[in-house]
């Protein structure tokens, strides 16, 4: 903020100089009012004076004020008093001329007297010494000692009063054209001056008596000097008006600068808030990536569990082979005697009960798994709602940031408009300065040309005035150069501000674009999660229906086996009680062996089907766990195995349970045996297909591709980091 402090210091210096110039102008005007008493003797010159006042009053504003500012830099205290008393003095200017205007002019009865050379010398001495007096009063006592009082003093006093009224009337006209002027200090002192101005007519009487021939030329020179002094007075008044307007304008610019500073600070605070919000959003994105990594670790754990399940399946297949060997041994024992058949049937019943118990346990575990799956679904729903709330909050923040950017753009437009207006004012100021300089140069040339016709004393006075005018011209040029430098500095600072605002707007646009991209990604992930949830719900319903169907089929088959076991028991009891012949016994034995073979095949098919159902239940459990633990993994439950298993069961039903009580011997038994062997082969093929389904291959390929994509995204994506601090800090 060093540039702002420098600018404030320069503005303060400029205001001090303006006040000093106004004070000195007022002081000069008070001292020069005494010597304008003889303007009434020359009405043509007075009319020309007023005309030139209106013509040159607006042109000599800026340059004369700058010269007076530089010439009198040490009168700040008097400037303060002059600025405070503006209102009361302007009222005096408006009322006092009307009082004097009501009095009749006695200039028509007054006979103009000629002054002597000592009086002219006193006048020049007074003009040279009037700039050093602090109060603007003329020491007229010296003139009283030199010039005796004549009887014509009342007429002189009246002429002085009329000249003062005409001068003040001209000043009042200038004040009405530009209100707010600070140069009206001469009004309260007019009532004190008639006693002092009485010395001027006495001096004029001596001049008329001493040198009547030289008086006409001297009076012409004095009238020219009065005209020039009146022009300078008018210029001083117009310059004071301009200084007042410049003071007001500087105050307004200071207020605008304070407002702009407050706006910049507010914008910096808003920018820091937006940076904090972006950091929070990035932290949320990092949390989501960590959650994805956790899901990947859970998938790896599920893979390990799948391998363990495969190992358990292999152990169960080994147990199945052991059971098959045991079954073959039981069959051999059953051939040895009918007593062993009852024992084998009992063991089969026990195994069926064990199978029922295992089925119940599996059902209970399935229910527990279902409850866990429902809890996880509820948790996913809660997470989805939280994500939706976060998305809405991000959209709201985006709209707020967009509004702030629009407001900043409007402020930039306003600053540009103010810059254009300042440039236009500077151009106008340059044009006015050039016109004033041209008018001054013309005046200097005219004074040079007229100096050859004047006397020695008038040439010295005009040369002094020329030197002063040249000095004023040089000082005004220096002031213009200073103002140009300040203008260039302000223009560069404004360009820097515009560049900074443009860069900040671009950064805000980039941040908004990043937020929009993040919101779009979150929306897509939300839609994917919703679709995955719906698919998992459908698969869960399919699984429930499938388990219900398998339960019903197993219960019906268990009832059928119990009925067959009861029939076998009845046959065994009937065998002991019957007294049939040997042929009947042989035929019955043959039928029993065939039925035993059929029952064995049925038991084998049931055991294989039971194993397949157990494997299917385990696979469904794994799929449900994987779906609940990793909803984004995109795993799908394959229902082809269930359909194939159901088709196999439907195909086994007519073969195994059709006409079990009639025509067990003969060709029918052979055909039935062949059908059972074919059915057994088809069941084994189904088990092989269940162990190696094509859906599992697709699932494995999909999981591998998903993990590969996640790793590529995590390794290649690099979030944008802002290392710079916010502007508010």
UniProtKB/Swiss-Prot annotation:
Coiled coil located at which positions? 215-629
**Compartments (UniProt record):** Golgi apparatus membrane
Q: Which Gene3D superfamilies has this protein been placed in?
A: 1.20.1170.10
Compositional bias of kind Polar residues: 175-186, 626-638
- Which residues does the entry place in the Lumenal compartment? 718-729
Protein origin, superkingdom: Eukaryota
| Annotated positions of the Dimethylated arginine modification | 27, 89
> What GO annotations for molecular function exist for this entry?
protein homodimerization activity; small GTPase binding
Topological type in the membrane = Single-pass type IV membrane protein
Q: How does it assemble?
A: Homodimer. Interacts with RAB1A that has been activated by GTP-binding. Interacts with isoform CASP of CUX1.
Q: What does this protein do?
A: Involved in maintaining Golgi structure. Stimulates the formation of Golgi stacks and ribbons. Involved in intra-Golgi retrograde transport.
Q: What is this protein called?
A: Golgin subfamily A member 5
Q: Which organism is it from?
A: Mus musculus
